[in-house]
């Protein structure tokens, strides 16, 4: 607003360039769209990201391995430690997850599709779009159902509306159901260039519409014989294919098993923390939000209620927690399990006045190591955060825990995926579980070889331990990563998680 008022508004007289409007250090480059959106003002000429590539050197560790080293690793004093790691590209010249956002926001052609066509704005100064191939697609609940190729010739500096004969919704969605329909158009290279092969995607646009012909009837639960036992230390439901155990002493679910394959090592734990990013360190987030590091991890159970459901075919359990913060803020975790071993899980935070904004809120779940595949319907394919969503597509994507652990020069928060509708966590054979958003909500998730504390403690990638588990995070919310600078600028207010507002994680778990 200040930039617009002083330089770009009615009183502006000169072109305006932001020398360094984004500092891309570590998991960063959040809020970049707030600056690129200023292109709507004729006097705005853009700005610069600091910078293109991390600066780091390969260093022999003396044990036959190498690591990317930074300030202080060569016994240099004084130094700026990892402050050389501020690139959109990693030091080995591979793209970081931030590149997904930068590429889309810097695209010279803007595509805005809807149900009947696409509006194309060509911001190039000299070249038309004649040499590009445009592909239109329709996805229903993330699955491509139709596509067609087009050649649109939009002159430089022009905006043109092009009609597209997308299929009718009634031809795609059953009249007795509901779905999320995504209309997508992308621009690709029709021929190879010196810098990219034919078919390389330059930019894309999506429009998402929710359609429903549903009569409101709930899906029937299909289940065989189930044995419900509420006596002893655990209450459980046992079937011929699996079991769910809800502890009366441990504060949650202690077994979630199908065909002998266990998904729980310890009951899922509350989390109100994330491994600090470089921007978090630079703006003092660790000091300001120190209480949240321990609040979830050391929360204590203050009440437990486990009983059969009214029909006698299921179980429900409510666990009351106190966070380990100054006010002992209450959190409620509720499980309800039906005869098909479908678990409805909610985690509710009521809000706490006069507290620093939360880094994150939800659950962190330790899984056996073999469950290292993540397939999800949400924003991807790369990691996304509340202030870094514009480069992501809505679709179904497959990742591994190792792939999602971005090798930032200093280990930190990584791998988060926003606006997730469902996620499947499986082994190499497809065995595992599915997490589905419930209650009209979305959730954020990550699956990594390391816990948040492991990432927080390591100073280099080679200091992370040998993976022995995978760590699943299911979050109601996580704050953005920021990116204005790495020496004081906070995450913009609209991308923080206010402590005085209620939060609720609402999901269904299925084996």
Question: Predicted segment positions?
Answer:
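Conserved structural-core and active-site-/substrate-pathway-adjacent residues in large, well-folded domains
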Residues: 20, 47, 102, 120, ...
